[in-house]
Amino acid sequence: MDIRRTVLWMIFSFSLLLLWNNWQIHNGQPALFGGPSPEQNAPATANNQAATNPASNTPAVPNAPAATSAPSSVPGSTAPAPAQAQEVVITTDVLRLTFSSTGAQIIRAELLKYPATAGSDQPMVLLDRSAGLTYTAQTGVIGAGQNFPTHLTPFAVTTNERELTGDKLVVRFEAESGGLRVIKTFTLDRGSYDVHVRHDVTNVGTAAQHPSVYLQLERDGNDPAGTSSFYHTFTGVAVYSEQDKFQKVTFSDIAKNKASYIKQADNGWIGIVQHYFATAWVPKEGTPRTNDLLQLQPNLFAARAIEALGEVAPGATVSSDAQLWVGPQDQQAMAAVAPGLELVVDYGWLTIIAKPLFTLMTWLHSLLGNWGWTIVALTVIIKAVFYPLASASYRSMARMKQVAPRLQALKEKYGDDRQKLNQAMMEMYRTEKINPLGGCLPMVVQIPVFIALYWVLLASVEMRGAPWILWIHDLSVRDPYFILPAVMMATMFLQIKLNPTPPDPVQAKVMMVMPLVFGGMMFFFPAGLVLYWCVNNTLSILQQWSITRSITRQTAKRG
């Protein structure tokens, strides 16, 4: 049996499978490997949602938890906002937040350290309420049969400070309704995307009340602007708890009432994730809360946590503290805010490999100061670590290349007698001490590491807006002049030339086409990823050439 041909066909078949999987995702079909498809993040039509989702008329303001007795009726998300709603804009060194006096909700968040696109002088807009995006952070107070201040209630701003001048910036809003006075205090620190949010709830009535505070993110189901159709990244809801750990939920599952997540917890967080960025509500640790994911309207979803405050006697005040992360997926900073928050950077089943790679990459960047050269250095280190395996692989391939003429002679000698041909081939392999799979197995061991590195480079917000040299001004977008993809195609052709030529003409043609197929795909991939593959291929070529030349010289000496 020609084992090489079988292995090559297996590789080719698997490549076709991957291409088909990407085609399925691109066309809104379920992924073959269980990943979410764009259909799960795409806007749903009103007809489909009305027919399949009974929750499409769910109010934007939650009902009180069952523990507080009968739920109250509250205004829905379509309730008109007061005409005199005021916008309050506050600015720190990293954030510009726009609050609406309606509910003291955050209706726009601009990340001042991140440009909207490569070369843009406009900041990245994460939260917004506009024609192209609905994505807001909201809070409020609810109670059984009561009309407490919610995110649809007019609030008055009671502070004058609008720009950060020291280390902290505080903005405060106040409203009174249903016998409760609610004061919302937002505290922002210099250099931080973590907003501390405090609710002080005072019973100004004559009877005891049982209020609950809710923390809510409201978002449409659309993919972020500029999402690539050539590689998939997750956009949806994430829930974390110590009990169930990190859980991702697609908007499609929420719309179909198929969402699986922890409902009751006293730890963790709830948020919405997209490529490079995230928002998350983090209630105080040890505080019991009810998590709720639901569809408010067609293509409008809410992720919320509800905390019961217990009985509040007349004249008494109770407080609730939480944190709101609104910013980049900065793993180190997020881990300092809450356990598990850094897991929004999700490497899947390769996390055990990817996290050490990211740590090493971060350390290298602290030395080199440039993410492009960091990728080069990291690739060199990985190739050095795997050099013994690569050496064994290349030596095996070099010896296979040397016996290729003898192998062809055996094929001509035995013709269609496959049994005798296989026996003769096995005898030749034993005589020459060649393992036909010796060139493949060492490479298979390295595959998980290289896939993990692929995900690290794809998911790391550090790549966004990071320049390398000359024409590469942003490693997170494609090469504007397609130089790196062209170099990658050239290195793939060189690798094929260094390998033994497949005896089957069809296989040989397939191998020559592969650089065109994969190189063509790289024209649309981030430059950082293509840089990694270019460096990896170049080092592989140098290793293979050096080892092959060494074996050729040794063979010539034995002569």
UniProtKB/Swiss-Prot annotation:
<keyword id="KW-0997">Cell inner membrane</keyword>
<keyword id="KW-1133">Transmembrane helix</keyword>
<comment type="similarity">
    <text>Belongs to the OXA1/ALB3/YidC family. Type 1 subfamily.</text>
</comment>
<feature type="transmembrane region" description="Helical">
    <location>
        <begin position="441"/>
        <end position="461"/>
    </location>
</feature>
<feature type="transmembrane region" description="Helical">
    <location>
        <begin position="510"/>
        <end position="530"/>
    </location>
</feature>
<protein>
    <recommendedName>
        <fullName>Membrane protein insertase YidC</fullName>
    </recommendedName>
</protein>
<feature type="transmembrane region" description="Helical">
    <location>
        <begin position="367"/>
        <end position="387"/>
    </location>
</feature>
<dbReference type="InterPro" id="IPR019998">
    <property type="entry name" value="Membr_insert_YidC"/>
</dbReference>
<dbReference type="GO" id="GO:0051205">
    <property type="term" value="P:protein insertion into membrane"/>
</dbReference>
<dbReference type="GO" id="GO:0015031">
    <property type="term" value="P:protein transport"/>
</dbReference>
<keyword id="KW-1003">Cell membrane</keyword>
<dbReference type="GO" id="GO:0005886">
    <property type="term" value="C:plasma membrane"/>
</dbReference>
<dbReference type="Pfam" id="PF14849">
    <property type="entry name" value="YidC_periplas"/>
</dbReference>
<dbReference type="InterPro" id="IPR028053">
    <property type="entry name" value="Membr_insert_YidC_N"/>
</dbReference>
<keyword id="KW-0653">Protein transport</keyword>
<comment type="subunit">
    <text>Interacts with the Sec translocase complex via SecD. Specifically interacts with transmembrane segments of nascent integral membrane proteins during membrane integration.</text>
</comment>
<dbReference type="Pfam" id="PF02096">
    <property type="entry name" value="60KD_IMP"/>
</dbReference>
<feature type="compositionally biased region" description="Low complexity">
    <location>
        <begin position="42"/>
        <end position="80"/>
    </location>
</feature>
<keyword id="KW-0143">Chaperone</keyword>
<dbReference type="InterPro" id="IPR001708">
    <property type="entry name" value="YidC/ALB3/OXA1/COX18"/>
</dbReference>
<feature type="region of interest" description="Disordered">
    <location>
        <begin position="34"/>
        <end position="80"/>
    </location>
</feature>
<dbReference type="InterPro" id="IPR028055">
    <property type="entry name" value="YidC/Oxa/ALB_C"/>
</dbReference>
<feature type="transmembrane region" description="Helical">
    <location>
        <begin position="480"/>
        <end position="500"/>
    </location>
</feature>
<dbReference type="InterPro" id="IPR047196">
    <property type="entry name" value="YidC_ALB_C"/>
</dbReference>
<comment type="function">
    <text>Required for the insertion and/or proper folding and/or complex formation of integral membrane proteins into the membrane. Involved in integration of membrane proteins that insert both dependently and independently of the Sec translocase complex, as well as at least some lipoproteins. Aids folding of multispanning membrane proteins.</text>
</comment>
<keyword id="KW-0472">Membrane</keyword>
<keyword id="KW-0813">Transport</keyword>
<keyword id="KW-0812">Transmembrane</keyword>
<dbReference type="InterPro" id="IPR038221">
    <property type="entry name" value="YidC_periplasmic_sf"/>
</dbReference>
<feature type="transmembrane region" description="Helical">
    <location>
        <begin position="6"/>
        <end position="26"/>
    </location>
</feature>
<dbReference type="GO" id="GO:0032977">
    <property type="term" value="F:membrane insertase activity"/>
</dbReference>
